[in-house]
Amino acid sequence: MLILSLFILIIYSSIINNIDTINLLSSSNKIGWKLQNYNIIRIGIIIILYSLYIFKDISLSYIFNNYNNNNDLNIYIFNDLYKLNIFNIYIIFLLLIVIISLLSINTTYLTKIQIKNNNNNISIGKSDNYIELNIYYISIIIFNIIGLILLLTSNNLISIFISIELQSYSLYILTGIIPKSQKSGHNSLFYYLIGGIGSIIILYGISLLYYITSNIFINNINLIYSLDIYNINNNILIGWLFIIIGLLIKIGAAPMYNWSILLYSNSNTIITSYISLIPKISILSYILLIILNLYNLNNLNNLFNNNNNNNLIYILSIIIILSLIIGSIGGLTQIKIKNILAYSGLLNIGYFLLIILSLINNNNINSILAYIIYITQYCFNHISIFILLIIAIIYNNNYNNFITNKNLIYIYELNYIKNNRYLIFCLIIIIGSFIGIPPLFGFYGKYYLLISSINSNYLFLSLLLIISSIISSIYYLYFLNITLFDNNNNKNNNNNNNNESLLIPSFNIINDIKNNTSLSLSNKLKNNQVGNYITYILSSYILIILFNFIQWKNILKGTYLISILLF
């Protein structure tokens, strides 16, 4: 019901935003047609809220009624092809919330600008950043949603590969969705080639598992692994290692990370906000599920005394060390916004993998709890910083009298928002949460991450985590310093009496643009507005990041209840 309501919501939103469809209607039917579709959208929103309310009550009762009776808390559907538990359901809910928030960013861009050139009216299409919220764009998003949901619930080797490719191909198309853009097509082809390498490695691991076990169901493979036959266990572990390495290549973990830096920096801002978060959450969550399925947690201590598991621990440790070192040091020399966010994402991949590694060596639900808390705060921080960047793009164009929305490339271009106290406050909160300053949400994520790694006796990795966090805070603070205190690049700012009205719903960002000698505006950019929901989303995430400690005990109880389902 929840998934159906989401599809209804985004499909009808795309239809309403399709200007060509509206123009086909007569003037008398346009108003009624719009109202009818807006009512359908409201129905979709009501279903989503009602589903969340039902899920809250059912999940808690399901936990208490089954965990106390030591029953199997997994739900198998479609002849054991897919498996549901409270963990992957939580991740799916989190992903759906993130996707809805990211889709709302698109509407902040200019649609079309009309410019009068002497005698003729010239239409300068859509801006470089604009992605029309049409049925094609929404179809790609829907296929991506289906792929990530199927991946998180897969209990079959074939369904794993199909789900990964369904998710990956939708992202390949998404990076090249901007028409008549050579850079967009180059990014799509580049992403496709790198993803193909990861798919080959994943397919080799799947074929190796099938060759050894003659079975495609994960439960049966794990049952064979539990027999503790040395040669078979070694080969099964190697097969899973190939799958995990292929998945890590697809999200840009070290040492194969360079492609992600180039892709994020050259892609559209909206696309970057999507491809830098959604595949990362789904793939890392599924790697955690692989570890949980591979090692029966009821006999965890016995299984990890075997030497067969050292290969997995060593390889993950190397990837974590490289990700932490490169992610923390690499951002120090960057002056581009997306490059810094890309290195920050690489650093956070190391954090996530450290939580997963601590789960291997620790029969404790603290690792699951740390993962849930950290991935939740990371999603909130990521969405908030990209919404702020989108608003800053329009704010920057207002000062520079740009005709079309240009991407913010360098950090100093954020200097134009420092006259707006609301945007600066949001930026300080987001950067503080990335650093991990208490009592912000990011502090609790890093706190439980550190506790989990120390309890697992990974003291060297815990020390490296602290050092990398300190080093990364340097470029986070540099990011903030350039924005707030660097006046060298802000000489051409115009005094605007309405600076602080940016976060007030329904207003025109660009009030006026100076006339050029040969060009004058025939339309004062009435479409260049920040909608109510954008400001509400940003405000809501900032309040969650800032005031989550008020009911922190209740949050911990909820994450604890989710965690115990896996043990």
From Swiss-Prot:
Chemical reaction(s) catalysed: a ubiquinone + NADH + 5 H(+)(in) = a ubiquinol + NAD(+) + 4 H(+)(out)
Cellular compartments per GO CC: mitochondrial inner membrane
GO MF terms held by the record: NADH dehydrogenase (ubiquinone) activity
This protein's UniProt keywords: Electron transport, Membrane, Mitochondrion, Mitochondrion inner membrane, NAD, Respiratory chain, Translocase, Transmembrane, Transmembrane helix, Transport, Ubiquinone
Root EC class: translocase
Pfam families assigned to the protein according to its UniProt record, in alphabetical order: Proton_antipo_M
EC number per UniProt: 7.1.1.2
UniProt subcellular location: Mitochondrion inner membrane
Membrane topology per record: Multi-pass membrane protein
Top-level taxon in the UniProt lineage: Eukaryota
InterPro entries recorded: ND/Mrp_TM
Transmembrane intervals: 2-22, 43-63, 85-105, 133-153, 158-178, 189-209, 236-256, 274-294, 312-332, 340-360, 372-392, 423-443, 459-479, 530-550
Function per UniProt: Core subunit of the mitochondrial membrane respiratory chain NADH dehydrogenase (Complex I) that is believed to belong to the minimal assembly required for catalysis. Complex I functions in the transfer of electrons from NADH to the respiratory chain. The immediate electron acceptor for the enzyme is believed to be ubiquinone.
Family the UniProt entry places it in: Belongs to the complex I subunit 2 family.
Name of the molecule in the record: NADH-ubiquinone oxidoreductase chain 2
Species this chain originates from: Wickerhamomyces canadensis
